[in-house]
């Protein structure tokens, strides 16, 4: 099983405030993330972390925390990721800036583009390829990005074609993510039933 998540910002105390995260402190946030992750992910699963796993890669506590997270971890590097410490880098099966994979929902296969940053025009977007991204958290920039994609579709831009353009923010603070890795099926289903429709304008 493949799972996806972004922008955990481990050991970044300021993220609790600017994301409005429902935790009193880092210890509480870390404990809940580990609990949700390890109650769901097995060591046979692959978790694609779409950037900003943490603010520091040379922290003994960070290395110890990430080491106990189950599964094969692939880090799609974000602007805050520091993997210069070999001990930390070796916790990931792969570290890269961009990835193209296939996943399935209900027996139907999908092409996915994985990147920390939202991409305005991605490979095969008109053929139904899904973009998973992070970086923008709950910011106005994320809403504008989604509105731009919807505008491209409405104006029949050639790279959008006739298909529904699918771009999903997998930031852990999003209502449909709720601080745990999600499968592609969960992301799609939970996003459309999110109690916060203002966060999912346009094509999500």
Language-model features: locations:
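Short glycine-rich loop/turn motifs that provide flexible caps or phosphate-binding loops at active sites
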Residues: 50, 77, 133, 170, ...
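Single conserved hydrophobic/aromatic residue that forms the stacking wall/gate
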Residues: 192-204
């Amino acid at each position: 099983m493949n799972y996806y998540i972004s922008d955990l910002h481990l050991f970044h105390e300021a993220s609790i405030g600017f994301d409005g995260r429902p935790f009193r402190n880092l210890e509480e946030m870390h404990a809940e993330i580990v609990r949700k992750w390890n109650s769901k992910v097995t060591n046979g699963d692959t978790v694609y972390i779409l950037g900003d796993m943490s603010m520091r890669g040379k922290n003994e506590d960070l290395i110890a925390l990430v080491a106990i997270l189950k599964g094969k971890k692939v880090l799609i590097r974000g602007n805050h990721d520091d993997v210069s410490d070999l001990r930390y880098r070796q916790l990931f099966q792969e570290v890269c800036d961009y990835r193209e994979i296939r996943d399935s929902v209900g027996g139907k296969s999908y092409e996915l583009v994985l990147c920390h940053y939202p991409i305005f025009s991605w490979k095969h977007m008109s053929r139904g390829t899904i973009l998973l991204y992070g970086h923008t958290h709950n910011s106005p920039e994320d809403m504008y990005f989604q509105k731009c994609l919807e505008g491209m579709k409405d104006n029949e831009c050639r790279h959008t074609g006739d298909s529904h353009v699918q771009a999903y923010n997998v930031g852990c603070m999003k209502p449909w993510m709720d601080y745990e890795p999600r499968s592609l099926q969960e992301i799609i289903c939970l996003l459309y039933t999110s109690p916060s429709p203002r966060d999912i304008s346009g094509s999500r």
